[in-house]
Structure formats: C-alpha cells, structure tokens
C-alpha cells in the first residue's frame, strides 16, 4: 500500500547551505520553545544520544512503531529549559517510485520511464514511524535533525523535515552535526546547531531519481527481452541494470578477458648464488631478463669462462617502513577484505553497529587527515588498559604523544575512523574488526619502523649482479600492527674490491604470467579510482552483481564473470556503447559533487543525464539483436523474435491534461471494444471520457489545438459508423475534444467547469460543429434560426449523450451547475412512486434525470429534463433544431419519427376514456422503465424544434413552453383575432383534450 506525501510538504525554503548560526541568534530563535523533537537515523543512535545528553536519566516511551522508541529528558538549550523528545526513523523514511500506472512491467514501454512522473511516498512498513513524527510534532516548537552527517543522512533529515512541516509549517528546524556518539561530541553538536544543507540533499534526490529511471528502463528492457529469447535459461531470471552495477561488472570482465587474451612469453636470465655460514645470498642480474635465448646464452657463456666475482660497490643506508595512514572508509573495506577476510558488505554492517554502540567514530568518511582540534591523547589513553595493546598505547604517551601519519583527503564532514571508547566485551567478527581499527589507530599514531639496508653489487665478466640485505633497528609500529610484515635479511660482510668464487652461475628460463583475477580489495580500488559509487555504496554494488549471478567467486575469493555477465558486457560493447566502462557514471558522480558545492543546479543535471541515458537506451533497443547474439555464445540457441511490439506494450501518447489532477490523459481501448480517454492518475483519479459506440477508430493526431488550455491539447483522428453522423458530415475527420468543438462536446458528453475561449481554428482541420452547421444551412433551410454554436452546452445533454456503461466504466451524474447531482426517490403516490431520480443538489438549475435510465443497457440515452418528475424533456441548448443524425425531433429521411434515444418511435393509441380516446401518438419503443419520455401526436404537424424548445439563454435551463414561443394561432385557424376561449391544455404535454392525470406520458 502506498501513502503519497503531499507535494506542498516538500517545499523547503531555507538557505541551501548548512551554515552555522550565532549563539545570540539561536537564543532568540529558542525563546518560547518548551519541547524539542529530536530525530536520529536509527533507534540505537537515538538511545545512545539521549543517554549521553540526559546523563542516563531519560524516560522511555513506546512509539507507534515497536522498533522506534521515544526517549524524553530535560535539557538546558540556548538559555531555555526544554523537554527533549528523542526518537528515530529506520533509514530512509520516504521512497521514490513511479506513479501506479507505470509500476507494472507490462504497463508501458520502458522508454516511457525516462519521462514518467515519479512520486515520493512513505512505504507501508514506515507508516507508524511517520505517524509518530506527526503526533509528536503537534506538541513541539522545534525540530533538531540527528541523522548521520553524510549525503544520505542529510537527505533522510529532509524527509523528516517534510513530514513534520506538513503538520506544523512554522516549525523551527535545525541540524546537529557530529562524527561520533560520545558525551563531548553530542554536547558540542547541541551547542553548535546549524541549518540543514539543502544542496547535499538535492544531490541524493538526483541520484535516486536517475538510478530509478535508468535502472528500471534498462532492467525491464533486458529482462523482458532476454526471458523470451532464452526461455529455458532465463525464464525466471531478473536481469537488472544499474549505472554503477555495470561498470563494476565491467572491471571484472575486463580483467578476465585480459587473462584470456594473454599470450605468455619465454624469457631467460642469469642467476648467481653465494653460500656462507649464515645461509645463501642470491644475486639478481641487473639486466633482469632477456627474451632472446641466443643473446642470453652468449652472455652466460662469457660469465662461465671467467666466473670469479668482484665486489664493485657496497652501500648502506637507513630504511624505513611507513606506518599506515589515518583510516577512511575505502581503506577500511580493502584492508578488512585482505587482512581479515571479511567482505566489504559485512565490514560496513559491523562498523555501523560499532558506531551506534559508541565504540568507533562514523565509519563512512572520505577523510584521512586527523583535525588538529581532535584530542588524540585522550583516545590513546582509553586503550592503555587492554592486556594486548595497552602497553604499546602507554609507550606512545611516554614518547611524546601521538603523531599521526595523515593522508591528503578530507570531506570536511567527518574525521578518519578511530576508536571512541574502549571495550573488551565484543565477540567474533565484531571483536576482530574493532581490534583492527584500534591497532590501526595506534600504529598510525606511532612511529615508522627503522632499519639499515645494505646493497652489494658484484661483477662477473662485465655483467653486474646485486644483492640486498636488511637489519631492523626499531620495529616501532610493527609491534602493535601484525598485519604488516618486515623481516631481517642478513648479508655477510663484503669488502669493496674483494673477490670470491660464486657457488652457482646458471642460466634459467621462465615465462611471463597473466594478471590475476580481481580480489574484492582490487575491485574497490578500481571503483574508487574511476569514481564509481561512493565509499558508502561500493559494497552494495559488489553484492548486487554477485546476487544477479553476473559474477562468482573462486576458492581463493577472486571474482570470475559468469556467462550472463560476459554476454551482457560483450553485447553492449558490440553496439558501440561502452556501458560497462566507468565514464558515464563517473560524470554523474562528479556532477553530484558539484551540486553539493552549489556549483550546479539539480534540475540541470537531471535533464542532462536523463537525456544522455535515454538516447543510449533508444539505440540499444534498436540494436538489441547484437545483445541476443552475444548471449547466445554463452547460453545456447536463442528464440527468434520478429517484432519489438511483441515484447513491449505500445506507449500511450498523452492527448491532454486531466482537468481534475493535471496528469496526462491518454487514449485507451476498452476490453469490450471501443475507446476512452483515461487519466494516468488512475486509480487515485478516475476522470475519463468514454467514446460512443459509433466511433470505429480513434488515434492521436500530431497537430495541437491552439485554443484549448492548458496546452498541449492534441487533436484526434476519428472515424464514425455510417449513419451515425449527419449526411453532410464526413465519417473521418480530425477534431478536438478539449472543449472548443461544441458538437464533439455533445457527442462525447464532455463537461467543463467553465467555458473555454474561442478562437479561429487552423486551416486543414474540420470541426464537427462546423460541418454540421454547413449541412443545416445548405440542406434544411429551416425557418427557425439555429442556436449559436458558441453557446455553452447543456449539462443535461452532456450527461444524456454519455455512452452505455459497463462494469467499471461509469461517469458521475452532474447537474447543469456542474455539481454532482443528488439521488432522490419519488414519494408522491402515482405510477412513479418509489422511482429514483437525480436532481440538482442546490436546487439552482431544475436539473432532473431518472436514475434507472441514466445507464440504459439498450444503447439509448437516459431520460433527462429540466423539471420535476413528469415534466417535458428538454432538447440540448447547443444543438437547437438541427438534431438530424443525432436523434432528430422531426421526421427522418425515410418518414419515420425517431425518439430522443435516436431510435424509431412506435405508434400507440389512447385507450383511456376521454376526449383523446382512439387518438394515435408516437412514443419511445423501449420498455416503460427505460423510456426516454418522448411523446408526439400523430395527427399534429409539429415543426422541427418546436417540441420542448431549447432553453433561453440565461433561463437557467428551463424548457420553453410552446405557447410562449409564439402567440400566433395554430395552423388552420380561420380567425387570428378570435376571442373564443381556448380549451384547457395538459400541464405535461401542453396539448388540449386531456389533463395531466390522463396524459399518455403519465402512465
């Protein structure tokens, strides 16, 4: 279930940078604040921070989420005694996804996903957390964000802000910045609150949206196609794509292919050894090796002719082995993989756990420089109690204190990873990783190992050979850092100019070897070098390509590409797009940094990147057979696919914006046949335009209406059934249903809240109303003038002309005011007692419609009038007297009389006693409960349009009485000025000879 977050709640107007505020400004801002809501990224962090700020005197309460508790405590903040309400989220509170209509894989062509609307919503499993925040916000005057101080943490902070400010827009919002959960760090953060940094959050929004669009489009493309091409192998396989996944896979494939393409070469070299009482010294040839056997053999033979060695040089110099640099995230992942055999994902999971427990500083950092204001002495002192490395820590303090070896990188957010608290209670990999971080920190703060290196160079037949020896003078950091090795290599004493007989002089052969497969540490190093992902996401991308079976691991934990991974990379490479190369993603990562620095606009980056990947996608789909061919080399015979349309559904093209929700409305086909215009916001928005059954074909034209708003409103190519339109109207034409074409408004039953502006139409496009009016004026030459086609159409007729509805295809009943009509029941005794009807909810427009005829199953139109039950049925005001072809009120071409349904009327005879007994009349042929209310005497010559004439402009839709339309005597009267009393007329049909009680319409 999805709970969309109101877009207005996302409007955040603080300054983009996370600047610090002066204490005076903060004291002013906190005046009157009694309760402060504090939100951390995880429950453990919230508990730890609350415990430190309250000195252990916090009060725990249950939140609506059982995993996220609430901790209350009193605190003195900026001159105010306040109650702090500390709670947490569980990572990201909100998620990005496409709108509902795009989420099903078969709902659209994947290309649409590059432009489809995306919404940010709260997943169902986080709703309780969201409700907790909303509930607590009501009672608080300020909000302090305590999420992790990195990009993701900043973005999570803004998600919290959006939720809370939707409840209380004037809520004061501040940001706590810290790198470790220690008493000093959290109190310092409280005393130096800053503003949240919108720019950093924007960078995450851009990355999330691009990952969603690019990943979803390519994943659907690959999966849907390849599952059909290789059904036996990939029928159940998700073949995902990610702009970081593929370059990561590309590194593995590239190394594997380099090994495959490697051609070994034989080389030759001369080796000299000299035995002495302490061992054997090996002298290496200064030429190293030769690939020419003959040349090496000649030199070897020269050496063998006079094998006496002469010592030509003895050098001795100090040698240092550098201690490790301060630890950043990438180095932690690499070293843990190499030294501890813990993979990167598990390393970061454990490191996050140690951080929230307060044992180490924040583990996601690009910094390898300790800040000068960090108290390293206190951190070293904490470790002096340990039985394994405590003595070494004490030695550091006794020798002048810590002197860390710094690197050259800083993210200006967090210090290098270091221990913040001593513990001896950890077990398993938790203990091993904590010990590594402590030992690395102590080694970094110690001294380099010192030694003395001796180099001896000898000459044999003018060929030079060299040997190296080492004596370690001071181990220093090596005493605490067992992960590095440096051993003595003793040499006997050689005097310059002395001679000795080598023990062996031999020519040996060898062969060049290919590079090794990548280890996880190698892969992370390549990702960092080429800007693929961040220190926080390297492990995630590696795990993804393993889970998708794109790569596997050998027995010695090296990456080997699988058949699927190889085929995908080779397939895309054969298209000419090096999607497995890091360039595209590296550009994006660079742009994200520029967004964080305020040097690039988020929307500009989004547009550029979407367009770039969209173009690649279009061409990749066009060349998809190359992907099939590449994979067939690894997966076997493929199934031929004839048409692209067989795999992907056609893209719905937007026709206009929905008047209700402003989303696109697209042309769709009903299951039962026929067409309708549907809102892309379905099911949240159910706006639709149902086309009548007379429409045989409908498609979007590329021309845009210059009148209708909001633009663009595309015209439609329409084809109607023969006989459904007036004879002079073409059955095929291009028309607009945006509201400017009055006749199409009537045909399609369009209802608009207000009249649209009218303007001249571009030439070349025929409007239905124009064709109809030309037909009326040229062929019928009626004495009654046509109603102005610019007149706003009657809501009643718009409703009456709606097509028959089936299950799931309904339009709400709207009165002439544009409001939803109210459903009532006839209470008065009579033939219609108990019958339901619709009426204007405000009583403003005298709208009336029988409920049982609003959804006629017989294909007719519903009974609709502008009067109370039993009154005359009104004609549409915008159609007037030219209704031929749509159910004319006059005689049709073959002499029959159609009713309001457009069907031939039947002739009946009055059976009741009275003056009209035996008189014939025309009425609707349908059963009584479905009749449209049409009535006409057979012996009466009724001019077209005189029956229930159209409403006068401004007359609130009331039907005009025939006698009001003309005061002239009826045709056939011999004396126009006669004063003979007129007979009483029926109040229903306005005909003489009977009353309402005996009217055939009131049966």
Curated annotation (Swiss-Prot):
EC number: 5.6.2.1
Main location per the UniProt record: mitochondrion
Top-level lineage group: Eukaryota
Record-linked SUPFAM superfamilies: Prokaryotic type I DNA topoisomerase, Zinc beta-ribbon
Cellular localization per UniProt: Mitochondrion matrix
All residue ranges annotated as the Toprim domain in the record: 35-179
Active-site residues annotated for this sequence: 362
Family the entry assigns: Belongs to the type IA topoisomerase family.
Protein name per its UniProtKB record: DNA topoisomerase 3-alpha
Native species: Mus musculus
Gene of this entry: Top3a
């Amino acid at each position: 279930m999805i709970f969309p977050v109101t877009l207005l709640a996302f409007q955040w107007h603080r300054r983009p940078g996370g600047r610090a505020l002066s204490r005076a400004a903060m004291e002013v801002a906190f005046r009157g604040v009694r309760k402060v809501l504090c939100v951390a990224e995880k429950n453990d962090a919230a508990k730890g921070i609350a415990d430190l700020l309250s000195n252990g005197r916090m009060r725990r309460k249950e939140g609506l989420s059982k995993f996220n508790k609430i901790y209350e405590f009193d605190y003195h903040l900026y001159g105010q005694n306040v109650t702090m309400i500390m709670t947490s989220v569980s990572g990201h509170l909100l998620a990005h996804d496409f709108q509902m209509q795009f989420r099903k894989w078969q709902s659209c062509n994947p290309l649409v996903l590059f432009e489809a609307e995306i919404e940010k919503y709260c997943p169902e499993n986080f709703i309780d957390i969201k409700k907790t925040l909303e509930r607590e916000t009501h009672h608080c005057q300020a909000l302090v964000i305590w999420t992790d101080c990195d990009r993701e943490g900043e973005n999570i902070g803004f998600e919290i802000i959006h939720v809370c400010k939707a409840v209380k827009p004037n809520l004061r919002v501040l940001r706590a910045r810290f790198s470790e959960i220690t008493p000093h760090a959290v109190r310092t953060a409280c005393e130096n609150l800053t503003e949240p940094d919108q720019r950093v959050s924007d960078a995450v929004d851009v990355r999330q949206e691009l990952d969603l669009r690019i990943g979803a489009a390519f994943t659907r493309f690959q999966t849907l196609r390849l599952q059909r091409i290789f059904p036996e192998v990939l029928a159940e396989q998700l073949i995902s794509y990610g702009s970081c996944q593929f370059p990561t896979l590309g590194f593995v494939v590239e190394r594997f292919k380099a090994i495959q393409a490697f051609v070994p070469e034989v080389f030759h070299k001369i080796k000299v050894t000299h035995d002495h009482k302490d061992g054997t010294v090996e002298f290496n040839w200064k030429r190293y090796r030769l690939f020419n056997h003959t040349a090496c053999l000649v030199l070897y033979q020269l050496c063998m002719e006079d094998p006496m060695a002469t010592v030509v040089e003895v050098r001795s110099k100090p040698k240092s082995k550098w201690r490790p640099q301060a630890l950043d995230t990438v180095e932690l992942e690499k070293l843990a993989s190499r030294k501890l055999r813990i993979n990167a994902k598990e390393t970061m999971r454990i490191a996050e756990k140690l951080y929230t427990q307060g044992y180490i500083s924040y583990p996601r950092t690009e910094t390898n420089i300790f800040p000068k204001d960090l108290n390293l002495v206190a951190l070293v002192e904490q470790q002096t109690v340990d039985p394994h490395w405590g003595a070494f820590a004490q030695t550091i303090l006794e020798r002048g204190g810590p002197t860390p070896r710094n690197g050259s990188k800083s993210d200006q957010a967090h210090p290098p990873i270091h221990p913040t608290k001593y513990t001896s209670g950890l077990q398993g990999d938790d203990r091993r990783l904590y010990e590594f971080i402590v030992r690395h920190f102590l080694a970094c703060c110690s001294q380099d190992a010192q030694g003395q290196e001796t180099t001896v160079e000898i000459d044999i037949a003018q060929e030079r050979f060299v040997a190296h020896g080492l004596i370690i003078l001071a181990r220093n950091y090596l005493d605490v850092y067992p992960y590095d090795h440096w051993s003595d290599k003793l040499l006997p004493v050689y005097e310059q100019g002395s001679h000795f007989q080598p023990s062996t002089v031999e020519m040996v052969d060898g062969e060049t070897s290919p590079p090794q497969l990548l280890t996880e540490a190698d892969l992370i190093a390549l990702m960092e070098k080429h800007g693929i992902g961040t220190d926080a996401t390297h492990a995630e991308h590696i795990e993804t390509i393993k889970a998708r079976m794109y790569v596997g691991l050998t027995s010695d934990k090296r990456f080997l590409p699988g058949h699927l991974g190889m085929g995908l990379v080779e397939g895309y490479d054969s298209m000419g797009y090096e999607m497995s190369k890091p360039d595209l993603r590296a550009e994006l990562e660079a742009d994200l940094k520029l967004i964080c620095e305020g040097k690039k606009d988020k929307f500009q980056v989004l547009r550029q990147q979407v367009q770039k990947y969209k173009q690649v996608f279009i061409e990749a789909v066009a060349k998809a057979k190359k992907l099939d061919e590449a994979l067939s080399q690894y997966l076997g015979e493929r199934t031929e696919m004839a048409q692209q349309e067989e795999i992907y559904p056609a893209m719905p093209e937007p026709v206009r914006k929905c008047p209700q929700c402003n989303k696109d409305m697209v042309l769709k086909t009903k299951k039962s046949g026929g067409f309708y215009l549907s809102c892309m916001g379905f099911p949240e928005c159910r706006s639709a335009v149902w086309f009548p059954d007379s429409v045989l074909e409908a498609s979007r034209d590329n021309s845009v209406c210059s009148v209708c708003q909001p633009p663009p409103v595309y015209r439609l190519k329409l084809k109607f059934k023969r006989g459904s339109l007036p004879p002079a109207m073409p059955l095929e034409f291009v028309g607009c249903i945006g509201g400017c074409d009055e006749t199409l408004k009537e045909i399609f039953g369009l209802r608009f809240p207000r009249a649209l502006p009218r303007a001249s139409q571009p030439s070349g496009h025929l409007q239905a109303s124009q064709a109809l009016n030309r037909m009326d004026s040229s062929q019928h030459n009626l004495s009654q003038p046509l109603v102005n086609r610019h007149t706003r159409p009657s809501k009643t007729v718009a409703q009456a002309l709606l097509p028959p509805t089936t299950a799931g295809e309904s339009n709400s009943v709207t009165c002439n005011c544009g409001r939803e009509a109210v459903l009532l029941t006839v209470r008065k005794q009579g033939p219609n007692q108990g019958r339901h009807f619709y009426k204007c909810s405000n009583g403003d427009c005298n709208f009336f419609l029988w409920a049982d005829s609003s959804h006629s199953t017989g294909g007719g139109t519903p009974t609709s009038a502008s009067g109370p039950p039993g009154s005359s049925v009104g004609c549409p005001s915008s159609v007037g007297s030219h209704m031929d072809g749509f159910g004319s009120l006059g005689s049709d071409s073959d002499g029959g009389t159609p009713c309001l349904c457009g069907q031939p009327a039947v002739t009946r005879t009055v059976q009741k006693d009275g003056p009209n007994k035996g008189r014939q009349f025309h009425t609707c042929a349908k059963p009584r409960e479905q009749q449209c209310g049409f009535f006409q005497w057979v012996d009466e010559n009724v001019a077209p349009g005189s029956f229930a004439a159209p409403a006068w402009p401004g007359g609130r839709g009331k039907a005009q009485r025939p006698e009001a339309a003309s005061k002239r005597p009826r045709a056939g009267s011999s004396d126009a000025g006669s004063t003979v009393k007129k007979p009483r007329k029926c109040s229903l049909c306005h005909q003489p000879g009977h009353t309402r009680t005996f009217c055939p319409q009131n049966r």
